């Protein structure tokens, strides 16, 4: 950033304080305020205290700058100078002097030479439904050591493969599972035997009228002699249609079985070359380097990026608090690095640095529906780093990643954000991050090509372990199997400690948000076939061992621990670790209705559980940056937490994801999925203009609009270019309405058009701020045309919105136009009346999906029915938040029924916005709370409420109470802001207002005043 933006918060007693001018000074280098002066703004006449750009000479890289500010008040009186604050610049691109290093990408094993086989009676068009059992063998001559053995297999539809009697690889029960080949490293198993027997059970599931079956296998064995031996599926295999005792054991006699039928060589038949084989996963690499520090250290910085994740240690001590670092991006566009102050970790003389690397979304090997196992950037983990050391005499010592580093395979055998991690403690190399460690058996790290993305300093706070929790209870399910209940829904992982367990003991930790009927953990998903949310720890046999994952996180409440010997309870213990991006809580909410306070707590918890460098949809099932979820959740996020840095980063991700023609995907970042898959969808992707507008509203940040203006307008122009009959089209809609497991039944063009309409107006408003008059005019005209087309298509003669696809009245189809200002004046009453009738007809229940839910309560209040909003909000039967609450929820769920897939999904929890804006009554205005409104119009069922938020200008707040004797309200306005205060009363004569409060008008049961800075008390 060439021009850092500076801000300060002002405080003053009394009323009406304001800033009239400021002066900024900046010094470079030195400690505190000791450096040389590089910029003095002089006295600048301005009330602005937010986003003031540095205006001095070009900043130098790797330099600390201190700054301070003084201001003048309304009487022209100058303040004292503020205490100095500082920023530090990072490396320029040409200063790295480092190479990306790591291991070479393995050659994937394909099915070359193998044939699709099945039993007699099958053809390439069809085969009987059911399971068949196959066997074959490979003799090894024993003239050399087995260096590597790999097997790859698939079946139409699923299979389990055994090697010498041990299960080696499987595909879970599914249809069309043949599309994903499964790979396993079986080197250890093959080394133990003179030959190999493969035994496979494969199942053809009932399917379409054309339902072929087939098994495809290739085993490859590499030896020290340079010779390679293979076992391929072909007509030489044996098959039977009856399972027999011991059929998978190597000594089983299969002579009575029948020869298999070779249906087609790989690449032919109905399967073609459509099998995708994920690259076989290699253990997480460890990289190290020893180095000398020639003298005392005055300052040291480590600039580092490890893809997808890294953990670094210097002289045995951990670098930084971050985990799962750096943040996830589209690696073909942007690669983030972090900067660490490591001054205290270094010493004169011998030093060592060690880094371990994880896969994340950069090198994932777990097949999944979003294709994260094969994005365009997919590669093995790699590292770039520069350690720069400053000495008291001004000299510098630098260490960079190059081919002098050493590398080996570490004890983390596999790591996946979806599947979990396998860690073999027997492979721990000892104190490998300390000097003097013998790394003679390690290899030389190889220089790798750089990712395509630009290397940039990470702009947001890295993910951290935020808190730790002891379990609420532990239950024995079966011998060696225990269920741990953490007592809360959370994102993160479990840390396990064991004592005196035998070497080689394998413990499995399976994580889930809910339980199956038998009391075990539910941890399955069709989106990620096979292993899911399961860690495995293999014990080293020490007196005490403690381990926790390093490169994956889970969404869970329950942890099922399996593989424990039947020993005393004190042989093991679990600690829950809460993990997310650290976000300061900037607001509070409280009221006399306990259920409303639960809503607030549950929503805040759910939001935090989904903050991992990007705003995700669910920490358990997907971990994707669904744009629609973020759009619906942003008002709550920005009110509850300090979101500016993290959402600024995600705005960059949105820009990176844009195609040349302007399209945005429904998940961001994206590896290619979400454009044609469930896209385009304006209800989701208009998050881009919405966020930019909210940045100005909440933070006074107009820089975001300037930075993104070209990509923003390109996106909106693309949306306008594809209108049909004047309406926007979409692949999504009011998702997960009651009774529907996905899209709603109505014509989704209604909501698509409404969201595009709002996006055009949001962008036109920002265009006015930036002075982009041509865009303002064009987008306002386009918005009016959309409004006209929407009303012509969907506003019926009976006075409410309906579509030709409606099975019945649709609440969202009427609530969204009311919320977005799309309803013509002469139809507003009838549209609202229809909405009220339907809510009441349903026994005061909502009938909305995620889109309608976000506006329903606020619409009811805006049109004078806070009593109905209260009835809906507090409803305890399906569908409603109270239904979740009474069934044990402590977070927001994805769907209204009890069998909701995710129980940690914030997009149905947006009622929290209504709590802040209507129950407590504090609503953001614009320009970083330069203006805001206080209007508590949802007081039904509530005796008192209060909320406060620390804005960029200071704390704004409201606290009100009502009794039979009257109403009282206290409003707090920070310096530099003006509040419009709506006091419940029929007339001005009923209100006691403080001196200095300017009366504006009386409207709809409220007497309205304007007040500047200060604390103000009103009664009525």
Kindly give the residue locations of the regions a language model identified.
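Non-transmembrane amphipathic alpha-helical segments
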Residues: 692, 757-760, 764
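Helix-terminus loop motifs that line ligand-binding clefts
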Residues: 170, 317-332, 343, 354, ...
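Extracellular/oxidizing-compartment recognition motifs
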Residues: 1-64, 68-621, 629, 645-646, ...
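Alpha-helical support elements that line or immediately flank enzyme active sites
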Residues: 300-309, 313-315, 493-513, 548-551, ...
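Active-site acid/base region of carbohydrate-active enzymes
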Residues: 309, 400-409, 568-602, 608, ...
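Non-catalytic C-terminal accessory modules of carbohydrate-active enzymes
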Residues: 373-377, 382-388, 398-436, 457-468, ...
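C-terminal capping/lid segments that line or modulate ligand- or cofactor-binding pockets
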Residues: 353, 423-424, 622, 640, ...
């Amino acid at each position: 950033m060439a021009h850092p933006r500076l801000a300060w918060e002002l405080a003053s007693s009394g009323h009406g304080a304001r800033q009239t001018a400021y002066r900024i000074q900046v010094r470079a280098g030195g400690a505190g305020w000791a450096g040389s002066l590089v910029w003095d703004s002089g006295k600048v006449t301005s009330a602005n205290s937010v986003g003031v750009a540095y205006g001095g000479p070009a900043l130098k890289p790797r330099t600390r700058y201190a700054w301070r500010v003084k201001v003048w008040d309304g009487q022209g009186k100058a303040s004292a100078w503020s205490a100095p604050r500082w920023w530090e610049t990072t490396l320029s691109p040409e200063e790295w002097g480092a190479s990306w290093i790591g291991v070479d990408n393995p050659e994937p094993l394909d099915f070359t030479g193998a044939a699709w086989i099945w039993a007699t009676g099958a053809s390439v068009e069809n085969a009987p439904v059911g399971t068949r059992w196959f066997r074959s063998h490979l003799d090894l001559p024993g003239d050399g050591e087995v260096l590597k053995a790999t097997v790859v297999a698939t079946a139409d539809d699923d299979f389990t493969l055994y090697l010498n009697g041990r299960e080696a690889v499987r595909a879970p029960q599914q249809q069309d599972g043949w599309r994903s080949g499964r790979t396993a490293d079986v080197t250890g198993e093959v080394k133990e035997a003179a030959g190999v027997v493969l035994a496979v059970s494969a199942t053809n599931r009932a399917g379409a009228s054309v339902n072929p079956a087939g098994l495809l296998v290739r085993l490859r064995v590499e030896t020290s002699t340079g010779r390679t031996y293979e076992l391929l599926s072909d007509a030489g295999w044996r098959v039977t249609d009856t399972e027999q005792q011991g059929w998978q054991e190597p000594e089983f006699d299969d002579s009575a079985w029948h020869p298999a039928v070779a249906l087609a060589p790989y690449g032919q038949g109905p399967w073609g070359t459509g099998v995708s084989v994920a690259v076989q996963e290699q253990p997480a690499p460890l990289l190290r380097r020893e180095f000398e520090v020639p003298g005392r250290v005055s300052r040291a910085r480590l600039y580092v990026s490890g893809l997808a994740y890294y953990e670094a240690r210097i002289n045995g001590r951990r670098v930084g608090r971050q985990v799962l670092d750096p943040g996830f991006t589209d690696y073909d566009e942007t690669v983030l690095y972090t900067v660490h102050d490591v001054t205290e970790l270094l010493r004169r003389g011998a030093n060592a640095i060690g880094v371990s690397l994880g896969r994340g979304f950069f090198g994932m090997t777990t097949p999944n529906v979003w294709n994260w196992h094969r994005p365009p950037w997919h590669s093995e983990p790699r590292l770039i780093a520069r350690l720069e050391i400053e000495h008291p005499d001004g000299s510098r010592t630098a260490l960079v990643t190059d081919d002098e580093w050493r590398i080996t395979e570490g004890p983390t055998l596999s790591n996946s954000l979806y599947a979990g991690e396998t860690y073999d403690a027997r492979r721990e190399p000892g104190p490998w991050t300390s000097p003097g460690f013998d790394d003679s058996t390690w290899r030389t790290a190889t220089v790798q090509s750089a990712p395509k993305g630009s290397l940039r300093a990470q702009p947001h706070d890295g993910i951290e372990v935020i808190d730790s929790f002891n379990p609420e209870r532990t239950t024995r399910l079966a011998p060696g199997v225990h269920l741990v209940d953490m007592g809360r829904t959370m994102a993160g992982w479990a840390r396990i400690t064991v004592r005196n367990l035998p070497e080689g003991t394998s413990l499995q930790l399976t994580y889930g948000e809910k339980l199956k009927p038998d009391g075990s953990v539910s941890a399955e998903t069709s989106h990620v076939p096979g292993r899911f949310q399961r860690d495995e720890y293999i014990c080293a046999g020490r007196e005490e061992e403690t381990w926790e994952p390093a490169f994956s996180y889970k969404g869970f409440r329950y942890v099922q621990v399996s593989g424990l010997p039947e020993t005393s309870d004190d042989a093991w213990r679990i600690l829950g670790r809460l993990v997310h991006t650290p976000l300061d809580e900037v607001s509070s909410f409280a009221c006399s209705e306990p259920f409303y306070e639960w809503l607030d707590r549950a929503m805040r918890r759910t939001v935090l559980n989904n903050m991992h460098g990007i705003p995700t949809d669910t920490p358990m099932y997907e971990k994707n940056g669904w744009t629609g979820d973020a759009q619906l959740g942003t008002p709550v996020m920005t009110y509850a937490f300090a979101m500016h840095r993290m959402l600024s980063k995600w705005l960059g991700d949105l820009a990176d994801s844009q195609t040349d023609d302007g399209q945005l995907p429904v998940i961001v970042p994206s590896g290619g999925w979400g454009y044609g898959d469930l896209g385009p969808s304006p209800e989701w992707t208009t998050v881009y203009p919405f966020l930019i507008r909210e940045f100005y509203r909440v933070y006074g940040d107009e820089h975001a609009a300037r930075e993104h203006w070209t990509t923003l307008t390109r996106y909106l122009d693309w949306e306008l270019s594809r209108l049909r009959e004047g309406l926007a089209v979409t692949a999504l809609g009011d998702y997960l309405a009651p009774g529907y497991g996905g899209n709603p039944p109505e014509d989704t063009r209604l909501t698509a058009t409404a969201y595009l309409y709002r996006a055009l107006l949001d962008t036109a408003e920002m265009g006015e701020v930036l002075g982009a008059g041509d865009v303002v005019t064009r987008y306002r005209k386009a918005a009016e045309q959309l409004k006209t087309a929407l009303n012509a298509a969907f506003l019926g003669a009976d006075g409410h919105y309906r579509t030709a696809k409606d099975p019945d009245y649709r609440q969202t189809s009427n609530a969204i136009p009311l919320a977005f200002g799309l309803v013509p004046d002469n139809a507003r009453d009838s549209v609202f009346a229809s909405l009220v009738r339907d809510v009441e007809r349903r026994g005061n229940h909502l009938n909305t999906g995620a889109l309608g839910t976000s506006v329903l309560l606020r619409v009811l209040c805006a049109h004078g029915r806070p009593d109905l909003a209260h009835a809906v909000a507090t409803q305890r039967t399906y569908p409603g938040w109270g239904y979740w609450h009474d069934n044990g929820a402590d977070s927001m769920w994805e769907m209204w029924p009890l069998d909701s897939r995710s129980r940690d999904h914030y997009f149905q929890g947006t009622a929290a916005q209504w709590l802040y804006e209507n129950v407590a009554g504090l609503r953001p205005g614009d320009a970083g709370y330069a203006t805001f409104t206080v209007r508590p119009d949802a007081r039904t069922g509530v005796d008192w409420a209060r909320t406060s938020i620390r804005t960029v200008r200071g704390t704004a707040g409201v606290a009100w109470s009502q009794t039979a004797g009257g109403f009282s309200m206290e409003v707090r306005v920070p310096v530099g802001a003006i509040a419009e205060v709506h006091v419940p009363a029929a007339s001005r004569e009923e209100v006691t207002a403080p001196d200095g409060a300017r009366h504006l008008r009386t409207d709809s049961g409220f007497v309205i005043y304007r007040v500047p800075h200060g604390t103000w008390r009103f009664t009525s």
